[in-house]
Amino acid sequence: MDDLDALLADLESTTSHISKRPVFLSEEPPYSYPTGNHTYQEIAVPPPVPPPPSSEALNGTVLDPLDQWQPSGSRYAHQQPPSPSPIYSSSTKNSSASNPQDSVGSLCSRAGEEEHVYSFPNKQKSAEPSPTVMSSSLGSNLSELDRLLLELNAVQRSPSGFSAGMVSVQASREPLGSWGTEGRAIILSPFFQDEAESSPPLPGALSPLYGVPESNNLLGGKAGPLMKEKPKRNGGRGLEDVRPSVESLLDELENSVPSPVPAITVNQGEMSSPQRVTSSQQQTRISASSATRELDELMASLSDFKFMAQGKTGSSSPPGGLSKPGSQLDSMLGSLQSDLNKLGVATVAKGVCGACKKPIAGQVVTAMGKTWHPEHFVCTHCQEEIGSRNFFERDGQPYCEKDYHSLFSPRCYYCNGPILDKVVTALDRTWHPEHFFCAQCGAFFGPEGFHEKDGKAYCRKDYFDMFAPKCGGCARAILENYISALNTLWHPECFVCRECFTPFVNGSFFEHDGQPYCEVHYHERRGSLCSGCQKPITGRCITAMAKKFHPEHFVCAFCLKQLNKGTFKEQNDKPYCQSCFLKLFC
């Protein structure tokens, strides 16, 4: 009722200056329309039905004037209206329509050439007066309206509001004399929004919105419905005629104010100013491309939220801040799903996301026997979106290639880096093939393999050179046969006399200072070799002149007599007896 009170206040403020403006009340004949001379003409004979309009006329390219619809030979005579009925209309010169039957401008342009045409009240010319005459006083109308509104408040529910900005088109099935066929009288009037929404559309008739056919409704929605048909006013009126309805009172009050109303021109195919119409039909006509575009916009929004979430990871959220991007994304997905369902777009879920356990609509990733949202199929370690990159599975969790190799791939013992391709397993360790080489010379191992010492791998040559036993003669590694003597290993070819390099016969040798010698060189090294015969002294020996001699080999160098008495003379490292020394040197 607050809306009705506001309506009455608006009506009072609007009609406060009505006393300064004329109010025209006229009586409506059953087959008449206003002309430029402000008189009524009545059709003499019902004309034949005109042919259907051409396709050009329907498309709004050809404007048929109203005169073309008049049959030839029709004559109209002035007739007294049988009963008073107020008619209010307004038109402009520029009003035009594509079809005379569904146009407001055609009817108004045919009415006359004035800028604004108002119907003047005709005096009662009939012999018999009307049973009831409606009062033209504005006060009586207002009091009647107040009484009706009180009754309406007691009986019916209060309406939701009065849409003063909307325009309804009221069609009357009374035939118009000037058209020559059954037409519709078009009256512009405000209407209640609830009543308009509850009224059903009229099939096959003019569209309730500005006389456009319903099949060609440019707004794609359901416009305001037609108001109730006005009954034909004959000579007598009943109780219902005496008590006008709320709609008729509103029409009278609205049209009593001579405020110019601009004509509404509707061309079939375009509309000069689109009206706001809310309808479920408009929503159900959305195309599949529109739904796809909404999904693309949603994916772009998801990417923006992802970047926002990554940028805000390091910073703490202020107290009382906004909700998390995850909840906003869930809200967006839920609202999109409900909106698509309301619009009639079937969104069949392509599966349930393995991460968020929610249905998937749009792009889907299939991996590891599950379906995922693209933004939820991320690396378990770094939480980066995997997308179309390669990934590895570990314990049912996806990992990107970098993190998987970093976490689970074997490490090279040499460089400690992850092994991505080929691997060499040796010494209970793993190696890159290019990092498994000799620890001494750096050469790669050939078919002969490698040798291990102290956890390191060596080639054959370096291993024996470094760790194999060395020969006592040549100091080289002994690889095959060897001779063990003097606490040393010897190559067989290296175990010989260290002086004459003669192999030992029957394996017997003499040792001096840790080296093997033959008998001769052994005694020579030791000084036990007879200086006279150059043979080893195995028994008694005489030591003279820092030399050793067999007793029988120590003789005079001139007479060769044995010097057994123990006296001799030495001259030039040679022993002489005393008589020979005197003879030779004295």
Curated annotation (Swiss-Prot):
A motif (LD motif 5) lies at residues 328-340. The keyword ATP-binding does not apply. This is Paxillin. Phosphorylated by MAPK1/ERK2. Phosphorylated on tyrosine residues during integrin-mediated cell adhesion, embryonic development, fibroblast transformation and following stimulation of cells by mitogens. Phosphorylation at Ser-273 by CDK5 reduces its interaction with PTK2/FAK1 in matrix-cell focal adhesions (MCFA) during oligodendrocytes (OLs) differentiation. Phosphorylation at Tyr-31 and Tyr-118 by PTK6 promote the activation of RAC1 via CRK/CrKII, thereby promoting migration and invasion. Phosphorylation at Ser-279 by SLK is required for PXN redistribution and cell motility. Residues 121-137 have a biased composition (Polar residues). Belongs to the paxillin family. A motif (LD motif 2) lies at residues 144-156. Residues 291-310 are annotated as: Required for binding to PARVA and ILK. Residues 353-403, 412-462, 471-521, 530-580 form the LIM zinc-binding domain. Interacts in vitro with VCL/vinculin as well as to the SH3 domain of SRC and, when tyrosine phosphorylated, to the SH2 domain of CRK. Interacts with GIT1. Interacts with NUDT16L1/SDOS. Interacts with PTK2/FAK1. Interacts with PTK2B/PYK2. Interacts with ASAP2. Interacts with unphosphorylated ITGA4. Interacts with RNF5. Interacts with PDCD10. Interacts with NEK3, the interaction is prolactin-dependent. Interacts with PTK6. Interacts with TGFB1I1. Interacts with SORBS1. Interacts with PARVB. Interacts (via LD motif 4) with PARVA/PARVIN. Interacts (via LD motif 4) with ILK. The modification Phosphoserine is found at residues 83, 85, 106, 119, 126, 130, 137, 140, 143, 259, 273, 279, 287, 290, 301, 317, 327, 335, 528.
